[in-house]
Structure formats: structure tokens, C-alpha cells
Amino acid sequence: MYEPRVRTKSMERFVCSKEPPNRSERLLQDSAKRLKISRAALEQIEKPYTFIYQRLPVEIEGEVVNISSGIVLHNRARGPYKGGIRIAPDVNIWETNELARLMTLKTALANLELGGGKAGIRVNFEKIYDQFKDKLKQDFYPFCDMLKDHIMKEFVDHFVERGLVHIYIPAPDMGSSAREMMLFYNRTHDPAVVTGKPEGIEGWLPGRHEATGFGTAYAIAKYLEYIGKAPSDVTVAIQGFGNVGSHAAYYLNDFGCKIVAITDLYGGVHHKEGIDVVELMDHAREKRTIKGFDDKRTIDNESMFRMGVDILVPAASGHVIDKDNCDGLGARLLVAEAANMPVSFEAFIRLKEKGIEILPDTYVNSGGAIASDLEYKQGLGGMRYSREEVFAHMRQRFDNIFESMLEIKDQAGSFTQAASDIALKRLYQAMKTRSLI
């Protein structure tokens, strides 16, 4: 069969830099071989439809500071572009691109009528605060909240002016929250403009705030049920105690798991008899960190990764488990990817060889996307869901995904590879149906 020449480096040439090696493309390439999808078709699925760069000027004490931001619209074959807004000092076009691609795969795996997109805002709050602190009257955290509001108002204005309402549907992500989503609603008065809105705002969804953490815990409980192990018989360590990590800890504890170690950016705590998760959540809510919760029993990320536990839950940032540290990983049973792409492709292969199961990010942290789908439809149609209905819907979706992965796991090679196969097949079929490939 004739296969046209594929310009696989077209985006790289345009932005004058090479896309770093990443797991999602490697997995998709392997899936394409198993599914017998051509290189030309895969190129159309892998690469983004468009990306937008936007400078966001904000004034601080009479000086203008320009903040860089970007939106990657990856794929809308199955529905509107969907994905969060990440605010961090290391945001870049390639990370945003891979996160958008992961959203495309995640929504396809969950069989949602949504596509994939992502926004990134590159800002170093500590650096800017240090630059202006002699002139400022606020402490660090109030300054960050004020600056973030100014940045987001600029971002929202450009979002609306570019006609992206209902084309790209934002949501909270690392560095953003319901507070930032409210600004979209304030500007548009459209309950379906974003998901993850604050409680009480038109179109808000009960259970959306904790959905990703609940989904993470439920995915782990589902796996334990599959292998015939009681939650009370396993120990868990969690990296990250933001919205995802804290709620994952809460629900895992509620299901009966023993949470023995938790870390965040500034510190960590280790209680071999089990951490009081509710007390830790109260502490973190007040201090914005878990540091200081128990100064006598602390732990750092490196030590926690090496400690012997049944389940490790990376719930913070990406690429934290790689070829350099995976051999020293202490998890005996499972790594559950609550964060996006926390395990590199090389580490994935090595852990697979060692018999350590990985539940993929596109499954484990899909609770936010599943709940967002309900919130978006609620905003469009005016129907209302209770928290119990939202969680019941999520459980059903997670059950369906797990059974779909399990059905082809042996053929694909792992849960991670099975998830990639399912998502790619659905995307390919949708794009063929719409004559996009």
C-alpha cells in the first residue's frame, strides 16, 4: 500500500526546537503498530491542531511585567478541546503540548464527547515577589493571589476576544483553582464557559472539586479488588498534597488503606502507624503546606520513593520517576499515576520488567475530566446533579474503563499500553468518520 511521505518534524521546524522525548508519543507509536494504523494517520492524531502564544502585561508598583502564556488545541475529533490551565515557573510549549495530547487520550479512554487542549502560564511568583518586595505592602501569599488575579483577567480577556468560548473549555490544574475559573464566568456570564467553578456559582457541580482525588482512590480500590487484596492490608505513600493528593489521601484512608507517608513541595511526614489525614488536611489548609505538621517524623521525596510500601501515588508533577531513580523505587505492588506523566517511558519499561504494575495517568486521574463532562453538559442544558449522582457516574465510568483495559491487557502488554490502544482506536475511528484522516 502506498504511504505518503510524512513531515513528522513540521511543528519542530516551525518553533525551531525539537520536541523532547516523551512517553505518550512512544506509547502511541507502539499502539499504532498493534492496531495497524499508518504513520500518516498517526501523525494527524499525535500533533496539535493549533497553538496560541499570548503575552500578558500586568502592572506592579508602576512597572509593567510581561507574562508568557500559551494554549495548545490538540484534537477535537470527539468534541470541544478540554483541559486545564497550568500556572508554574517552568511551563513551556512542549510540556503544554504533551499535556494537551494526554487530555485527548484521557477523554477518549473515558469515552467522553470531548477532545484535548491545555493552557500554560509561565510565571515565577517568588522571583517577582523578591524583585518588588521592598515596595510591596503585602506578604507573599496575598501578593501571589493579587498578581494571579491580574494575570488571569488578562488571560480571560484574550480568551474571549479570540473567540475560544465553547471551542476550548478550561478547568483548574496545577497553580489554578475554582477562584480562577470564576473569572471566566464573571467575564462571560456563561455557566458552560469553564468547568471546576466555585460552589454556588451558576452551573457548579457538586463533587467536582474532589473528583480527581476520589477517582484516584477509586481506581486503586478497583485494582485491589481485581488482585483480591483488602485495602486494610496495604500501605500507601503519596507525593503531593494539593487538590489531587489530599483528596486521594482522604478517600484512600476512608476506603481503609493505611497512608504512611506524604510529601509536598516544602516537606513531608512519615507515620508508620498511619497518618491522620483529616488533621493533615486542616494543617495544610491553614499553612498552605504540610511542613510543620510533625517535625519529629519528617521525610523527603527521595527517601519516600525508596521506602518499602505497597502502593506509591505520585500526585504532584511530571517526570519524577525516571531511568535514574526507578531501580531504587520501594513500591512493591503498584504505582498509581495521579499526576500527569510522572513515570518516564524508560522507567515504565524498567518497572514493567521488575513486575511492578503501573496504573496509567489517563485512567487514574480521569475523574476530573469525567466530572467536568457532567458539569459542561449541566451548564449547557440546565439539568442538575447531586454529589451522590456525580460519584455514582464516576464509579460506573471507572468500572467501564478498567474492564476495557483488562480485556486487552495481556495482548497489549500492560494496563498502560492497553489504555493507549483503546484511546488511539477511538480517536482513529472518530477522525475517519469525520474525514479528518
Q: Which residue ranges define each predicted feature?
A:
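Glycine-rich phosphate/diphosphate-binding loop of Rossmann-like nucleotide-binding domains
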Residues: 198-203, 207-309
